[in-house]
C-alpha cells in the first residue's frame, strides 16, 4: 500500500508554484469602424504613434496617418478586401522599415522591398527606416565631382555633380525617362550604384526599362523599385522613400549612388488621394497643405557626405510631368524650388527631331559647374555662348530675308552645333568623345559640311581618333585638361579625317 507523505506533496506544489511564470503582454488594440477606398477608420488604438504600422486581423498592414480625438485614420498597404467592420486591429510598435543589403543589386522590388521579379527571396541582415532624417549641414560637403550622363547637351551646358538634385521636367512623351535611363547606362564601370523608382507607371513601361538595362548589362549595379498604376495609393506614396533608403544604405558605406524618381507628379497624386479620403483639408489644386514637405524631405536626403562620413554621395534626378508646358503649376514650382537646377524637355523640340529635346536656354544647373572637369570647361564655354547667340539670331532671321555674310555664317554654325547635340537613345558618349565633338563644332571644322553630313562625320571622327590618336584620350583622362599637346593631336586628327571624309563623299 502506497503511503502519502504530506511533506512530499507540499514540496511538489511549491516547486510547481515557483516554476509558474505568467507572461503578460500588453497589446494596443482597436476596432474597425469603417473601411473602403484604401482607408480604414479605427476606434481605440489609444497609444498609437503617427506613422506607426498597425496589423489587421486578416494580416493586412496599414500606417496610422490621422490621429483624431475619436478615431484613427489608417491607410492600407494592400487591397484590404478581407477586412470587416468590427474586426480587431493591433499596433505593432514599429515604424515602416525595409531590409537592406548588397543582394538587392540587379533585382526588381516593390515599395515594401519584396522581390517582384520571380527570382526568389533576397537575403538581408540589416534594415533601415523608410523615412530617415536627411544628413545635417555638418555632415555634408559641397558638390565637386562630376556625374557624367553621357549626353553632350547636359554634360557640357547643364552639368550634374555627385550629390546634386537635378529635376528633369517636361510634358509626357518628351523623353524624360530616356534621359534618366541613359544616365544609368553611362554609370557602367564608374562604381556608381543606381536606383530607379517607377511610381504609378504602366507595368509594360517598367518592363521595357528593365529589359533595356538588362540587355546592356546595367542591371548588375541597379535596383528597380516599382509600384505600377494598379498599386494601392499608399504603396505609390511610399515607393520613393523605399528607393531613398536603399540608396542611403550604399551612400553611408562610402559609395556613390544615383537615384531616379519617375515620376514625382504621380506620387503627389497618390498622396492627394490618400489625404482627401482621410478628409484632410485640400489646398491649391486640391493637394494637401504638406505636399511641399512630402517632396522636400525626400529630396533633402540626396547629399555629398563629408570626409568624416566617408565621402559617399547620393545624386537625385526627380522627374516631373507638366501639362502643355505649364511649369507654373503647383508640383513643378515646388520641386523646382527644392532642387539644384532643372533640365527642361520641350515637346516642340522633340517633334522637330531634336533629341534629346533639351531646351538649353531655360535649363540650369545651380551647382554642377563646380563639378565639371577643366577640359570640358575649356570647350563648353564657347558652345554655350554660340548657341545662345544663334537662338537670338534665328528669331530675328525669320523676319528678314537679306542677311549679311557674317550673320549667315553664324546661323550656319549654330545649325551645325545644334546637330552636334543630337544623340540616339542608349548611346551615351564618354567625356573624351564629348570634348572632341564640341571642339570640332566650335572651332568651325563642321562649317564646310552639309547639315545632313555632320552626324555621319562625327561618328567616323570618334572611331578614327580612338584608333589613330589614342594618346589624346590618355592625356584627357589622366590630366583632365585639354593640354596644348592634346589640342594639337586633336587638330591633326580632325584635319586628317575631314580630308578623308570629303574624298569619300565626292566618290
From Swiss-Prot:
Keywords: ATP synthesis, ATP-binding, CF(1), Chloroplast, Hydrogen ion transport, Ion transport, Membrane, Nucleotide-binding, Phosphoprotein, Plastid, Thylakoid, Translocase, Transport
Keyword Transport: yes
Gene3D superfamilies with a match to the protein in the record: 2.40.30.20, ATP synthase alpha/beta chain, C-terminal domain, P-loop containing nucleotide triphosphate hydrolases
InterPro entries: ATP_synth_asu-like_sf, ATP_synth_asu_C, ATP_synth_asu_C_sf, ATP_synth_F1_a_nt-bd_dom, ATP_synth_F1_asu, ATPase_a/bsu_AS, ATPase_F1/V1/A1_a/bsu_N, ATPase_F1/V1/A1_a/bsu_N_sf
PROSITE patterns: ATPASE_ALPHA_BETA
Its membrane topology: Peripheral membrane protein
Entry EC no(s): 7.1.2.2
Subcellular location: Plastid, Chloroplast thylakoid membrane
Catalytic reaction equation(s): ATP + H2O + 4 H(+)(in) = ADP + phosphate + 5 H(+)(out)
CDD domains for the chain: ATP-synt_F1_alpha_C, ATP-synt_F1_alpha_N, F1-ATPase_alpha_CD
GO cellular component, one term: chloroplast thylakoid membrane
UniProt site (Required for activity): 363
Entry binding sites for ATP: 170-177
Pfam families: ATP-synt_ab, ATP-synt_ab_C, ATP-synt_ab_N
GO molecular function: ADP binding; ATP binding; proton-transporting ATP synthase activity, rotational mechanism
Residues that bear Phosphothreonine: 257
Family assignment from sequence similarity: Belongs to the ATPase alpha/beta chains family.
Subunit and interaction comment: F-type ATPases have 2 components, CF(1) - the catalytic core - and CF(0) - the membrane proton channel. CF(1) has five subunits: alpha(3), beta(3), gamma(1), delta(1), epsilon(1). CF(0) has four main subunits: a, b, b' and c.
Function: Produces ATP from ADP in the presence of a proton gradient across the membrane. The alpha chain is a regulatory subunit.
Name of this protein: ATP synthase subunit alpha, chloroplastic
Primary gene name: atpA
Amino acid at each position: 500500500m502506497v503511503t502519502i507523505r504530506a511533506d512530499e506533496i507540499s514540496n511538489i506544489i511549491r516547486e510547481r508554484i515557483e516554476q509558474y511564470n505568467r507572461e503578460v503582454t500588453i497589446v494596443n488594440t482597436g476596432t474597425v469602424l469603417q473601411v473602403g477606398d484604401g482607408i480604414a477608420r479605427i476606434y481605440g488604438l489609444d497609444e498609437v504613434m503617427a506613422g506607426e504600422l498597425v496589423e489587421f486581423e486578416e494580416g493586412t498592414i496599414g500606417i496610422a496617418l490621422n490621429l483624431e480625438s475619436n478615431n484613427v485614420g489608417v491607410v492600407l498597404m494592400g487591397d484590404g478586401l478581407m477586412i470587416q467592420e468590427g474586426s480587431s486591429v493591433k499596433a505593432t510598435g514599429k515604424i515602416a522599415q525595409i531590409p537592406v543589403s548588397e543582394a538587392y543589386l540587379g533585382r526588381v522590388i516593390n515599395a515594401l522591398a519584396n522581390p517582384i521579379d520571380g527570382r526568389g527571396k533576397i537575403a538581408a541582415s540589416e534594415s533601415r527606416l523608410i523615412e530617415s532624417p536627411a544628413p545635417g549641414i555638418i555632415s555634408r560637403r559641397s558638390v565637386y565631382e562630376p556625374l557624367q550622363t553621357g549626353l553632350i547637351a547636359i554634360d557640357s551646358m547643364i552639368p550634374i555633380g555627385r550629390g546634386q538634385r537635378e529635376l528633369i521636367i517636361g510634358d509626357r512623351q518628351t523623353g524624360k525617362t530616356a534621359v534618366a535611363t541613359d544616365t544609368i547606362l553611362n554609370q557602367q564601370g564608374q562604381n556608381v550604384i543606381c536606383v530607379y523608382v517607377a511610381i504609378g507607371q504602366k507595368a509594360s513601361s517598367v518592363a521595357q526599362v528593365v529589359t533595356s538595362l538588362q540587355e546592356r548589362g546595367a542591371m548588375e549595379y541597379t535596383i528597380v523599385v516599382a509600384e505600377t498604376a494598379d498599386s494601392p495609393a499608399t504603396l505609390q506614396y511610399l515607393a520613393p522613400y523605399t528607393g531613398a533608403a536603399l540608396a542611403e544604405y550604399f551612400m553611408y558605406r562610402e559609395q556613390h549612388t544615383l537615384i531616379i524618381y519617375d515620376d514625382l507628379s504621380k506620387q503627389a497624386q497618390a498622396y492627394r488621394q490618400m489625404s482627401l479620403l482621410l478628409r484632410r483639408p485640400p489646398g491649391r489644386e486640391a493637394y494637401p497643405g504638406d505636399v511641399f514637405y512630402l517632396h522636400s524631405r525626400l529630396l533633402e536626403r540626396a547629399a555629398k557626405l563629408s570626409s568624416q562620413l566617408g565621402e559617399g554621395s547620393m545624386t537625385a534626378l526627380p522627374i516631373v510631368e507638366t501639362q502643355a508646358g505649364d511649369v507654373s503649376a503647383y508640383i513643378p514650382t515646388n520641386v523646382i524650388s527644392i532642387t539644384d537646377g532643372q533640365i527642361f524637355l520641350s515637346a516642340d523640340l522633340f517633334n522637330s527631331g531634336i533629341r534629346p529635346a533639351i531646351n538649353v536656354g531655360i535649363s540650369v544647373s545651380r551647382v554642377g559647374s563646380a563639378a565639371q572637369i577643366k577640359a570640358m570647361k575649356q570647350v563648353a564655354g564657347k558652345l554655350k555662348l554660340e548657341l545662345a547667340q544663334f537662338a537670338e539670331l534665328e528669331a530675328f532671321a525669320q523676319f528678314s530675308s537679306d542677311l549679311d555674310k557674317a550673320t549667315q555664317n553664324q546661323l550656319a554654325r549654330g545649325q551645325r552645333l545644334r546637330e552636334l547635340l543630337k544623340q540616339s537613345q542608349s548611346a551615351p558618349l564618354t567625356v573624351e568623345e564629348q570634348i572632341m565633338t564640341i571642339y570640332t563644332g566650335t572651332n568651325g571644322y563642321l562649317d564646310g559640311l552639309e547639315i545632313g553630313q555632320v552626324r555621319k562625320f562625327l561618328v567616323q571622327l570618334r572611331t578614327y581618333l580612338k584608333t589613330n590618336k589614342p594618346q589624346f584620350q590618355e592625356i584627357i583622362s589622366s590630366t583632365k585638361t585639354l593640354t596644348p599637346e592634346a589640342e594639337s593631336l586633336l587638330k591633326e586628327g580632325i584635319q586628317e579625317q575631314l580630308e578623308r571624309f570629303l574624298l569619300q563623299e565626292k566618290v
